[in-house]
Amino acid sequence: MKKALLTALLALALPAVAAEKELLNASYDIARELFARYNALYEKEHPDAPKIKQSHAGSSKQATAILQGLKADVVTFNQVTDVEILASKGKLLPENWRERLPHNSSPYYSTTAFLVRKGNPKHIENWGDLAKEGVSIVFPNPKTSGNGRYTYLGALGYAQDTFKTEAEQHAYLKDLLAHVAVFDTGGRGATTSFVERKIGDVLITFESEVNGIRQEYGAADYEVVVPKISILSEFPVAWLDKNTEAKGTTDAAKDYLQYLYSEPAQRLLAENYYRVRDEKVQAEYKERFPDVQLKTVEDIGGSWEQVMKEHFANGGLLDQLQKR
């Protein structure tokens, strides 16, 4: 009887033990393939590490899900404000979280690029061409997607360099938005609309995504256009102290993110067309990445907080420009 009871108790305990051996990485929409490859590399180098599970959606949708109870151990997002809200509103990590890892907790970065169909029939070379008559564009909704916000801000940065007055800049943005064929909630939805549903002449998304599409669907059918001036897109990462402390996974979560800065991980990132911090790896993959003048969010809008309030809040400039 005692033996049977002990066996039953051990059986009940096993799921709890297994749960402690898992890390949940909540990430942005188009990072599925990247983190499948990174997790395989990490687990190969760390055979005793917890099993890594993934959750993917638009960066802002992920932040909302976590605030509503998704017990992520780590976040690998594409916009700083989506981590900030987890600190300020959710109290899941300290306000100085960007100081805990190198490069403001952004182990890699990208920029916004264009994917056009074979032969570039609409002759797309820069941001101005996106608003030409007869051009139909696809990118994620800036309301729900960090990817989409970078596209909007990249266009604004171009407008600031090209047009003298704010009225002219806003007129360009309004014209650009009028050329959007579909606003998907996330980057992968936008890719599906462009590639599989054949909507639009130009897909605007991260440089890593446009090159990934050419690899997956065939380089002969698409061309990549990287504008001479674009926006610096940082990819912040963080462990969520409140969740990891409750689950006993803090050390594992830290190690998982710190390994992103290692040479093998940086090489994997570069292979997947992300721009990296490691100078040796940068030099190895230099031919993959065209020279671009990268403007920061701060260059364009002052700060993320200011940008979110002025452009993406309800009733902000984005909403105003979309009114017909």
What is the role of each PLM region?
Residues 9-18:
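Hydrophobic h-region of N-terminal signal peptides that target proteins for export
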Residues 244-324:
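Extracellular/periplasmic juxtamembrane helices and adjacent flexible linkers that interface
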Residues 1-4:
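Positively charged n-region of N-terminal signal peptides that target proteins for export
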Residues 18-89, 100-101, 206:
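Early extracytoplasmic/lumenal segment of secretory-pathway proteins
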Residues 69-75, 134-136, 197-202:
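Alpha-to-beta junction loops
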Residues 87-161:
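A conserved helix-loop-strand patch within extracytoplasmic ligand-binding domains
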Residues 161-228:
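Ligand-binding pocket segment of bilobal, Venus flytrap-like solute-binding proteins
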Residues 111-120, 234-251, 268-272:
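A bilobed periplasmic-binding-protein/Venus flytrap-type ligand-binding module shared by bacterial periplasmic
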